[in-house]
Amino acid sequence: MKSGEFFTVEQLKKHRVIAITDIILQEVSTPEVDDVIRISDDSGRGSGKIEHEHMKPALCILAAGIGSRLENFSEHINKGLLPLNNQAIISHLIDKTPEDYDVIMVLGYKSEMVKEYCKIAHPDRNFIFVTVDNYEGKETGPGYSISQAKKHLQRPFIWVTADTVVTDDFPPADYNWLGLYPTSIPELYSTVNVKGGSVIDFKNKSKDGYDYAFIGLAGVYDYETFWKQLVGDEIVSAYYDVDKY
């Protein structure tokens, strides 16, 4: 920055005042500033620009599958277009993110129908459509689907399956988080062990699982770690080693 220039730190972005002397040192989140000297950073980050703080986050909706568990309900329509309160499910998901987020739609089954709907229902949003070459049978699933959009997700992002329904707005993609819901049947779901608000273990469809089920919604801040951990068609494989995050 040059002499006389300034920037505004948005509310809640300032963490604390470090010291007040002739010079005021403040800890702030400043993606507007390229040249930063970090003194005693809590996360051990070095000085200088942090690339992903300058990237526009994205919302990735996984809508490639045929929706077989819905049986006749998805016979003629993509499951993400099924109505909920007079609006398609994917519209509820899109509306829960800031308008400047890119929306990456990973498509397969009834893909053209979904494209047409998105363009008409959300003309002000920037969509990137990714078509999955294989969305039925073996070696398919959300892990495989999201891998097809990898080049568009080299930045913090939120991913969600097209049939996920939540009532609250999504948290921002400026930290790693998972969407959870209580369950008494862990053998049917991927479940997590939560301690002090943090995930300390993850099990996939085990009778020895935990009390909170993963609902197919997550915020990915450490996207490089996510891609390194992801294996095969099971997207939850990216979270088996939670200590990596």
What role is predicted for each listed range?
Residues 1-16:
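Short acidic-glycine-tyrosine-enriched beta hairpin
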Residues 13, 66, 163-164:
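Active-site metal-binding loops of divalent metal-dependent hydrolases
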Residues 16-55:
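Double-stranded beta-helix
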Residues 29, 63, 107, 161, ...:
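Short beta-strand/turn micro-motifs composed of small residues
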Residues 55-61, 69, 83, 87-156:
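Conserved N-terminal catalytic core of the sugar/cofactor nucleotidyltransferase
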Residues 155-165:
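Short beta-strand-to-loop acidic/aromatic patch adjacent to the donor-nucleotide binding site
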Residues 166-237:
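Conserved core of the sugar-phosphate nucleotidyltransferase
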Residues 237-244:
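An accessory alpha-helical subdomain
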